[in-house]
Amino acid sequence: MRTQTHIGVMMLLTCLSFIPGSFGKEKETPKPTAWGYVRGQGVEARLQTSGNKPALTRLGHGALVTVLDPGAKGSSSSVRIGAVDPATLSPQTGNIDLSQIEIMPLDKFPSDAELLRLVGGRFLDDLIAAGTTVARFLLRQGDQPPALLCLLGGSDLPYTQLQVFLPSRGKLVAGPSLNFPTSEMQVGLASVEVRDLVGDGNECFISREPFSFGPESGGANYLIRRIEDGELKVLWKVPIEFRNLALFPPNPEVAEPPEDNIGAPGTISRATIEFRARGNVSQPVWKGKVEFYVFGREKPVQSVSIERVCPWDGKKFAPLR
């Protein structure tokens, strides 16, 4: 009798799990209620991807996130958001301080599906569109309405697309774009930052972009771009990591000027970029070191340190070399 009762209870629970509104129903993903524009110097937030523990993530100035619902109960200063990591294009969720974002209405910007239709081409395919993740950034354009810059990509796509949407008659239209092969980029850009470097209100888009010339040669470039006359213009491009161990010269020699050693055979170069104010302009500074290697030795035989300020000439920043 007990066995029959147990079987009956299990059958009842199984049936209830398929009834709408029953306790067997899976929790629905929260729907966006607004947009959140990350302002100021950006924000450090504890976000998590699906199934992972929360990790400290930096949301840079200019990032556009979705507001999902209020954060912790009883805390009016906390809000739950959805964001996309530009390096992996993986969706993340978590709580941040409400004071660190500017709330914008949901109808101010098109949905992801609407943006993909504006781009057209391969994104009109339903399967491709469903597997595409969109990371968003706002670029202020002086007195003009801001432009929307998006990273479009996914693990099954051959390249990640950097797509600009320009304001036109109160709407957004697809503007210039760049493609990055996923064989080099993995999925997204290693880092993204938005800053007004020139002081005219026309914000720049700063990115760290990996490159590869083979298993023993590759690194990452640091690029500063901004929108001018409806196009993405490169204002500065320098390597901040450059490993070239495909060849080793028999007798390494330090070239002059020192920056000419960056990327030379048998060297590893690493640098950080700082910005120094000069009037209204923030000038980039390349600070790093080039290490020289010989075949068969793990440690460098010599190194040279470099620090170079690259001033603004009115159109672009001076090249490193």
Provide a role label for each language-model segment.
Residues 33, 57-98:
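SH3/SH3-like beta-barrel superfamily modules
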Residues 47-61:
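SH3/SH3-like (including bacterial SH3b) beta-barrel domains
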Residues 8-18:
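Bacterial N-terminal signal peptides
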Residues 1-9:
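Bacterial N-terminal signal peptides that target proteins for export
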Residues 56, 86-87, 151-156, 183, ...:
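Short consensus segments that form the blades of beta-propeller domains
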Residues 137-153, 196-211, 271-289:
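Acidic/hydrophobic-patterned starts of short beta strands in beta-sheet-rich repeat architectures
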Residues 24-30, 34, 53, 62-65, ...:
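Acidic, small-residue rich beta-repeat scaffolds with periodic aromatic anchors
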Residues 102-189, 317-321:
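Terminal domain-start segments
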